[in-house]
Amino acid sequence: VTGIALKPATIPALFDILKLDEKIDSRIIDIRDLDSMMKVFDEVQPEIVIHMAAQPLVIDSYKNPVYTYDVNVMGTVNICECVRTHSSVKSFVNVTTDKVYKNKEWVYGYRENDRLNGYDPYSNSKSCSELVTDSYTNSFFNTLDLAVSRCRAGNVIGGGDFSGNRIIPDCVKYTINNESIQVRNPNSTRPYQHVLEPVTFYLYLGMKQYNNKDLAGTYNIGPNESDCVTTGQIVGLFCDTWKEDANWSATDYNGPHEANFLKLDCSKAKSSLNWHPIWSVKDAIEKTVDWSKSYYNNENIEEVTNKQINEYLKEVESWSQF
């Protein structure tokens, strides 16, 4: 496995905690640097490419829209160009976001054929990333021995996320400091899921379409409808699971626009690939709290991480070939 990314953006960072630079072929490269990207592709000759690199935060995209578009749009152009010029690649998966859709605040989930038009610079840049991939597919990839898919995942949670302005990392930060968790949009609904759900799907899809191009396409990946909860509900679950007097309160939010209601219809992935979510949102919170407490109690976090991955993969065996 070869990974291309920037240096970890947080201290601490899961990449450093697990010493992944000692376990995989890790290249610290900006995906906007096409020449450096081409050199890695020339050397490695990859067969399966999964594109997850991004500026991933809505609030940061308001602060720095040019950088966001540069990374998320031109970065995708560069990845597509590397894929186009390397015949070794047989399977390509571009990971975007559930926020690519034109949000109409519907009470039902968006389907893969609904209109794309993200509102904020982050969401819109990811809509653009989809259009770039579609154009490259129509113009170039369709003439190659290459399967191309796009995946739109809901909000991910899990141990090891230390990013700012994300609900569960904020919950952990406030709680370990014995402070009340401040929630800016408690009534907003999001398709929260454990990070292992979409990541496993990307790997599974990359493998399946490598052997069967007919499976290539666009897929939503999110929780079952019963697990689409409000931010207030998921914070409440966190507090109930963490215990130790964990509590939260709503705070006034005067920041830039964020969607209030967002759900995904994942029927296509369930039907075409026999996929289904493994862990409920309650399970996801329990795993996240377990990981976080283990980390702050100075336990062997690599063992904890591997244990959770293996528990998940054992359950995944029911529908996959992993």
Residue positions per predicted region:
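NAD(P)-dependent short-chain dehydrogenase/reductase
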Residues: 104-109, 113, 121, 127-210, ...
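Short acidic donor-binding/metal-coordinating loop in glycosyltransferase active sites
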Residues: 65, 97, 153, 159, ...
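Residue-level signature of the cytosolic catalytic core of signaling kinases
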Residues: 7, 20, 29, 33, ...
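N-terminal Rossmann-like NAD(P)+-binding domain of SDR-like oxidoreductases, especially those catalyzing
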Residues: 1-153, 312, 322
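C-terminal substrate-binding subdomain of Rossmann-fold SDR/epimerase-dehydratase oxidoreductases
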Residues: 3-4, 175-322
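Residues in well-ordered alpha-helical elements
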Residues: 34-35, 47, 59, 66, ...
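Generic anion/oxyanion-binding catalytic loop in active/binding sites
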Residues: 26, 38, 50, 57, ...
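Residues that form or immediately flank small-molecule/cofactor binding pockets and catalytic motifs
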Residues: 31, 97, 115, 155, ...
